[in-house]
Amino acid sequence: MRYKIIFCFILFFSTQNIYSSDSISRKIDRNFYKFLAVEGVVLTGAISYLKNEWYSDKKRVPFHFYNDLKGWNQIDKLGHFYAAYLESTVGYSLMKKFNFSENQALYLGGSQGLILETPIEFFDAYYEGWGFSVSDMVANTLGSVFFIAQQKYFGEQVIMPKLSFSRSRYARTAYGLLGKNNLLSEFVYDYNGYTYWFSFSPKNVFRINKLPDWLNLALGYGADGMLGEFE
């Protein structure tokens, strides 16, 4: 399943003083509706994009599964993991800004990667050439869990997933299958240019105070020579 681009709209609301438990409750109720509104905008934008970009030339078919575990040498799975992680990060940050409790922000906000990606996976299941991918769902789940676990046990994100992209030579000879010879199109279609990283400070991860603050390590994974999902 190709990597889904999710549009994240971050709204900023001004804070105000709260003087009673009743006002706190009312504010949280209002903020919950604001949060749902933001989530609705994100999901609507994502599905609209996919419908126009991915499904416009595809035939609608009955619900079916699709096994793409080996597709794109697992770069796509890392893409799902990374997208879910980012969505969970934004969800948690929004709920904290809306004055939800730490547990509410952690478990509801931190689950946004899985919550937002799941409807899209079901949407895939009804189009020819796509399908419901169990491995995508596993990757989505792991992305959210990775955020929640770090926030729960470290109080911060000590291992940061990151993405780098550079244009590959394959897109120019793939007859449009890997993009239309421009940066944005190739970023969407050409997995040869992707490298996913796990970046961390050994001092923060291993709690060794003698290590310098500036020391940072990163482990990356990319793939090369791919002209199609299984080629």
Question: For the regions a protein language model found, what residue spans apply to each?
Answer:
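Hydrophobic alpha-helical membrane segments
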Residues: 21-231
